[in-house]
């Protein structure tokens, strides 16, 4: 989802608690000794690059945070190091044990010590999706390096129209709070702070507690992850995620949408967010009337500050000339028929593109197409791809369709590209 800010408090004046509900200060006092600030430090200078939060979940010092808080260290352990600071000011080095990229979770371990550490437990109801909508919650973290802060809000259930499982929390989660706990009145963990929605007020998100609990259990029965294994494990998780996603994509219905003289397939699944727009009533009067439809699923898998994946977008725009002659309309379409160039980054190669003309069948218009892809440098057979298709049978109307995918094997990209092109047909 565009507009999500990772590593995301607004402190409201305390009100007298309702009967049976603990005061905010009681919740904080009960959790304080389990709280951590987690810092990714630049190795040489020791200055923080990323600051987040975390919380201890067992007496031996196992702690939960977000993957994106430790992502730089995970990918570049020679350039960064991990450090924690607890509520008493104790600090030390952290060991990265495991992560769940799709859930944006990581497990770290604090150094051993003689005295057992205070630990938070998971709310059993949260492990079964049993938290009631509207139930009061408290989110804790260290926003903007200002010190540990507690924020009161409400549990608003799982987010609709999202492929990734997230809980909507109506409380302010600010930068630095990512990885901190969201607690129930029983002072047990119901979720992990992960993000806020930019452009909205008190729209924040939690990773459901069951994902953190599952990661903890796996870590207790498996050997700790060696740093040299991190990239390979990330690649495995990305590969597993995209295979599951495209299998789910095959299981949904695809219905033809009508665009003037054409039809084009659109996904029918709750986890797609679809919007439509038109400029027909704009002023001044447009010379070309456009009607657009866009469907997008954005699970926003954060791999690194230079690499986010997990997006699929399908867009169709029907264009009808009002005042342009055929030559002018062709020039207008040429300007619209373009894909942004990608020269490559530290994490991906530059784009390579192929253009041509195709017609899926006798019932389909001929399409001018361009297909672009760039590969992930760190992960084999994973690509970002974009496909653009334009009808070319008329001097006064046209359909421009776009498919964009981030994080796909080439075989899955070709399969989705074929489905996309074959879905563009004449309207009967």
Show where each model-derived region lies:
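Flexible, gly/ser-rich surface segments that form the specificity/activation loops bordering the active-site cleft
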Residues: 19-23, 69-74, 118-165, 174, ...
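C-terminal cap/linker of serine protease catalytic domains
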Residues: 20-28, 94, 116, 189-262
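A conserved glycine-rich beta-strand in the N-terminal activation segment of trypsin-fold
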Residues: 20-24, 41-60, 91-93, 203
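Catalytic-histidine neighborhood of serine endopeptidases
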Residues: 51, 58-103, 110-113
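Catalytic nucleophile loop of clan PA
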Residues: 55-56, 172-193
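Surface-exposed amphipathic alpha-helical segments
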Residues: 213, 223, 270-272, 394-428
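Secretory pathway targeting signatures of secreted, lumenal, and periplasmic proteins
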Residues: 272-335
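Signature of long, low-cysteine stretches enriched in small and polar/charged residues
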Residues: 329-394
